[in-house]
């Protein structure tokens, strides 16, 4: 997500560690019905990636979404038929700043979160609604509409339902397609990659 450098926020780069989420290869069946879950049973994070000649002086960030809820509707055959997710754009908090010349302070993290809220997302709701789910090669491709910062566009991601009852998926988001300008600093030598990842990892409620 882009940040206005004039705001005085030390947000040179955002990133998620490589391999932070490894999706399984087997798609399991689920109990028919509507499964609701949220922060109490999982995590929703935004992972961003730095680039540019000066990327070594920047930080990679992992941003937690603190308030969110999701639903998965499952048909009689045990296969999901719909996915919905809503998140509070004012609840994004920086969990960790990786790499960089010096660690992020608590103030740095708070300033970054404030800038994301006020200058980027504007407190507008974040929502995803599926329109089609396709099962193939032991995985589920979820297609639908994603709303960020007042703009709604098509989006898709791979979802994995694990044998332990967990659900995981990574949704790539190209910021500029939602009207968000990725951060650039040091005359363009340090940039936030346009495509970020929204990573879900949660446990579905048991019977």
Residue ranges with predicted function:
Residues 1-3, 7-9:
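Hydrophobic alpha-helical signal/anchor motif
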Residues 14-207:
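Low-complexity, acidic/polar, glycine-enriched regions of mature
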């Amino acid at each position: 997500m882009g940040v206005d450098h004039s705001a005085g926020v030390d947000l040179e780069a955002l990133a998620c560690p490589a391999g932070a989420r490894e999706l399984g290869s087997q798609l399991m069946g689920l109990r028919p019905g509507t499964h609701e879950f949220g922060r109490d049973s999982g995590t929703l994070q935004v992972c961003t990636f730095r680039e540019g000649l000066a990327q070594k002086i920047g930080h990679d960030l992992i941003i937690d979404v603190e308030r969110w809820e999701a639903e998965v509707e499952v048909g009689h055959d045990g296969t999901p038929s719909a996915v919905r997710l809503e998140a509070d754009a004012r609840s994004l908090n920086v969990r960790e700043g990786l790499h960089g010349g010096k660690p992020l302070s608590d103030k740095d993290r708070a300033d970054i979160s404030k800038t994301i809220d006020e200058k980027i997302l504007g407190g507008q709701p974040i929502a995803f609604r599926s329109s089609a789910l396709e099962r193939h090669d032991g995985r589920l491709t979820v297609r639908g509409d994603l709303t960020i910062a007042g703009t709604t566009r098509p989006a898709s991601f791979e979802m994995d339902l694990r044998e332990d009852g967990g659900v995981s998926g990574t949704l790539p988001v190209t910021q500029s397609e939602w009207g968000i300008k990725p951060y650039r600093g040091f005359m363009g030598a340090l940039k936030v990659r346009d495509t970020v990842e929204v990573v879900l990892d949660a446990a579905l409620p048991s019977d």
